Swiss-Prot record:
This is Large ribosomal subunit protein uL2. Belongs to the universal ribosomal protein uL2 family. Residues 1-23, 224-281 are annotated as: Disordered. PANTHER family: LARGE RIBOSOMAL SUBUNIT PROTEIN UL2M, RIBOSOMAL PROTEIN L2. One of its GO terms (molecular function) is transferase activity. One of the primary rRNA binding proteins. Required for association of the 30S and 50S subunits to form the 70S ribosome, for tRNA binding and peptide bond formation. It has been suggested to have peptidyltransferase activity; this is somewhat controversial. Makes several contacts with the 16S rRNA in the 70S ribosome. Residues 12-23 have a biased composition (Polar residues). Part of the 50S ribosomal subunit. Forms a bridge to the 30S subunit in the 70S ribosome. Keywords: Ribonucleoprotein, Ribosomal protein, RNA-binding, rRNA-binding.
């Protein structure tokens, strides 16, 4: 999918870019039976208190019900359309099964309208097909990977992401995956995954260009703690551009913000991680 750049006719357009959806999407209206109303929470809980900062003010949208489980086995489906989904970075495609049911799935890279896909234990290794990790050869790139059998895909669902199968245990119970973050971990071989890489990989190349586009997405401004009052943030207070006055940066709630591992130490799945993800610098 090509990235469109605009002439600098205004300051907002000067550094703006977007994706050219006309060449890849079908242009069909979404399937009404797979739409539900998406309520705005603006980062508030049932008491009206902010639990997630920097959220609110996005445009109205419907939620598309996505089939992450891919549990309709041995029934072929035809890709009817490839559509835009405002709720995620990846595109989605509408499947029409032979028995008449319709479902949305994440659109893999290279999938075409009219293509056949199928789920099952012993299906072909083709893009869009879903099957257990135990039946997928080593070196294959997969996405929408389950962490619990039958629980639905959790790993590698964003645009352009995938996980690679590196090997299998001698007893066949676990499969070793390398994730996009660089982490290597063991997953139960009975978990399912979909062949291929998630499409719309150019999503990360888009520049919003102005604050208004970020507000349309529901992202509110991020205010630095050093310009707040002392009651609002540990970095607040002082005259003009003073240092934060602490040994290390802190979160708004007074905890160390840098260099601290945030993963719970007693999680049972820690023993399944063979190599930690690469630290971003």
């Amino acid at each position: 999918m090509a990235v469109k750049h605009y002439k600098p006719v205004t300051n907002g357009r000067r550094n703006m870019s977007s994706l050219d959806y006309s060449k890849n999407l079908s242009g069909h209206a979404p399937e009404k039976s797979l739409l539900v109303i998406l309520k705005k929470n603006s980062g508030r809980n049932n008491q009206g208190k902010i639990t997630v900062r920097h959220q609110g003010g996005r445009v109205k949208r419907y939620y598309r019900i996505i089939d992450f489980k891919r549990n309709k086995d041995d029934i072929p489906a035809t890709v009817k359309s490839i559509e835009y989904d405002p709720n995620r970075s990846a595109n989605i495609c509408l499947l029409a099964y032979a028995d008449g049911e319709k479902r949305y799935i994440l659109a893999p890279e290279g999938i075409k309208v009219g293509q056949k896909v199928v789920s099952g234990n012993n299906v072909d290794i083709l893009v869009g097909n879903s099957l257990p990790l135990s039946n997928i050869p080593e070196g294959t790139f997969v996405h929408n990977v389950e962490m619990q059998p039958g629980g639905g895909g959790i790993i590698a669902r964003s645009a352009g992401t995938s996980a690679q199968i590196l090997g299998k245990d001698d007893d066949g119970k676990y499969v070793v995956l390398r994730l996009k973050s660089g982490e290597m971990r063991r997953i139960l071989a009975r978990c399912r995954a979909t062949i291929g890489t998630v499409g719309n990989g150019e999503h990360s190349l888009v520049l919003l260009g102005k604050a208004g586009r970020s507000r349309h997405l529901g992202v509110r401004p991020t205010v630095r703690g050093s310009v707040m009052n002392p009651i609002d943030h540990p970095h607040g207070g002082g005259v003009s551009k003073q240092p934060i006055g602490r040994k290390a940066p802190l979160t708004p709630w007074g905890k160390k913000a840098l260099g601290v591992k945030t993963r719970k130490t007693k999680k049972s799945s820690t023993k399944l991680i063979l190599r930690r993800r690469k630290d971003s610098k």
